[in-house]
Every structure is written in C-alpha cells, then in structure tokens.
C-alpha cells in the first residue's frame, strides 16, 4: 500500500480494533509509529527540500585567498518566501494544510578562518533561539579555495555540509485543538499543539566565479553553480483522535542551485554582500499526472568584518 494516507488510516484502524479488544488494558494512549520513505517529489518531501535549500551555506561573495590566521566575522540574513495555500498543503500526502509561514527572515552567524596553502574554513550556526514557535539548531561548515584569482577574474571551489534540525508545531498548530476533533476547523483531530522535528542535512559542491571592476568602490560580482545532496527527516509528534502520532518521514535526493550577487567594500575591514539564490524543486501534488517545478527563489545578505 503506497499511499501514505491509506497506510496511516489502516494503522489507526488496527490500533482501534486492538484497543477495543482490550489490548490497551491499562488505558495507555495508542501510538502510531510507522516509517515512510517518500519519493523526492512527494509534497511533504518538497516542503523539506524548500527549507533545506534555504539553509544551504552558499559563498555569498567571491571565494578569496585569505592569509593563514585571518578571521572574518559575519551575520547572514536569509529571506524566506511566503507560501500560498497550495504550497502549504503538504501533510498526509498533500491533503493537510500545514503552518509553514513562520519566519520571513532567518539569521545565521558565520566565521571564516584563513588556513595554510590558500584554503579557507567557514563555519555557520543558527542558534537554538525560539522565534514564533520555531527553534532551529543548524550547524554548517565549508572548506573553500580560490584556484584562480587575477586582477579582474576569479574562480573558486567550495565543499560544504550541514547537520541539525528545527522544532515547531507544524502538524498541529497551536489553537487547532480548541475546535472539536473532526470539525471543519480541526479535520485531522488535533488534541494539542504538536512537537515536530525536521532534520535539515546536506552536502554540496559549489563553483563560484567572480569579476572585479577596475573602478574604485565598484562591487565585486559573483556567480555560483552547485550540486547538493539533501538528507531529510520529519518526525511527527502529535496527539490526534486519541492517538500519539509518531510517524517518521524520510526523503533524500539531489538538487542543483545557482547564485548571483555582488559585494561592496565599506571600509578596510567591512564588506556587505547580496545574493539571489535559485533552485528548481520538483513536486507532484495530488491529482497531477507528473511532477512540476516549484522552485525556491529568494534573497540573501551577508555583513562581514575582518577581525584580524
């Protein structure tokens, strides 16, 4: 049975029959604990791809040769596009609208370290501060090297990865439990705000080219292309219709992405960069005969300060 909705319904029915027959003897709450390997274009997989792609540790500027021991501190801002109702309807195979529009902007701390032989290590961190019911703890890192750096043209290569997760009441948003289970306002029987966890992990390889104008105060332009492997998991933790839903959804696959932007020097030690990010993301929604492209297109910014 490939349909996740039918599988969960069958599992709930089995639990009900066992519970009614007295297997739930001590009155413990039945637990729905199944694991679903999703196709990469499944609606729920698309939602995970969307937010994982938003967290990719892109160059956000040209790949530069730093002296060994140099340290740059940075603050990155990542805009998150607003999702319409169709895009938010990803739960239960694309039939349940989820509360995905939480934060319009993410912030990430970045530190770049100059290493011997022209390498640079970049570390990024989204600290676990709870904002609008979302608490993310994402650790990312990259190793990069400028393989060509002339007076005007440059080319660099980067290898990056991320581990971490985000927690929020995605499945049962706060307030849904106030309506009777099964009612139009609470059709999926939420009894309390859920405590879901989504794992956003990846590894990627990026090539970044750059161009420097001869004019003073002119920006440095950059263009990047990357291939990414996304490894994602959504752990449901919701009480619905008398059950504790602990369904685990897994998805992994490859994406490509492109970036274009510019970086300005604001002084001897400070730089500001902006970037447009694009990644095509396939999705097959209920009723569709084939996959469509519902891409991620958004803006990023980075303010850097040379500490030493």
Where in this protein do the model-derived segments appear?
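Outer-envelope beta-barrel architecture signal
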Residues: 30, 67-73, 117-119, 151-157, ...
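Transmembrane beta-barrel strands of outer-membrane/channel proteins
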Residues: 73-79, 121-127, 157-165, 221-229, ...
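Hydrophobic, lipid-facing positions within transmembrane beta-strands of outer-membrane proteins
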Residues: 69-71, 105-109, 137-143, 201-207, ...
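Transmembrane beta-barrel domains of Gram-negative outer membranes and organellar outer membranes
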Residues: 29-150
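Outer-membrane beta-barrel "beta-signal"
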Residues: 294-308
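Transmembrane beta-strand segments that form the barrel wall of outer-membrane beta-barrel proteins
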Residues: 119-131, 139-143, 155-159, 270-286
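Outer-membrane beta-barrel transmembrane domain signature
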Residues: 29-50, 79-84, 88-90, 172-271, ...
């Amino acid at each position: 049975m490939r349909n996740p909705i039918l599988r969960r319904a069958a599992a709930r029915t089995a639990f009900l029959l066992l519970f009614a027959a007295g297997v739930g003897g001590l009155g413990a709450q039945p637990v729905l604990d199944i694991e679903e390997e999703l196709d990469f274009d499944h609606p729920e997989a698309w939602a995970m791809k969307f937010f994982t792609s938003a967290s990719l540790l892109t160059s956000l500027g040209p790949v530069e040769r730093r002296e060994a021991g140099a340290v740059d501190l940075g603050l990155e801002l990542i805009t998150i596009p607003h999702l319409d109702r169709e895009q938010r309807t990803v739960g239960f195979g694309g039939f349940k609208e989820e509360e995905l529009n939480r934060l319009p902007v993410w912030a990430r701390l970045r530190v770049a370290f100059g290493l011997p032989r022209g390498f640079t290590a970049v570390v990024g961190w989204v600290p676990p501060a709870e904002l609008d019911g979302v608490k993310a703890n994402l650790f990312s890192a990259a190793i990069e090297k400028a393989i060509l750096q002339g007076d005007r043209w440059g080319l660099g290569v980067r290898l990056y990865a991320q581990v971490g997760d985000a927690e929020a009441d995605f499945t049962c948003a706060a307030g849904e439990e106030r309506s009777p289970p099964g009612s139009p306002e609470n059709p999926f029987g939420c009894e309390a705000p859920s405590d879901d966890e989504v794992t956003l992990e990846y590894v990627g390889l990026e090539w970044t080219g750059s161009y420097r104008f001869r004019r003073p105060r002119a920006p440095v332009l950059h263009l990047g292309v990357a291939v990414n492997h996304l490894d994602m998991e959504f752990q449901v933790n919701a009480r619905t219709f008398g059950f504790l839903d602990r369904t685990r959804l897994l998805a992994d696959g490859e994406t490509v992405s492109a970036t274009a932007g510019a970086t300005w020097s604001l002084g001897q030690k400070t730089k500001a960069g902006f970037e447009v990010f694009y990644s095509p993301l396939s999705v097959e929604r209920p009723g569709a005969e084939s996959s469509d492209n519902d891409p991620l297109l958004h803006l990023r910014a980075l303010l850097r300060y040379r500490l030493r």
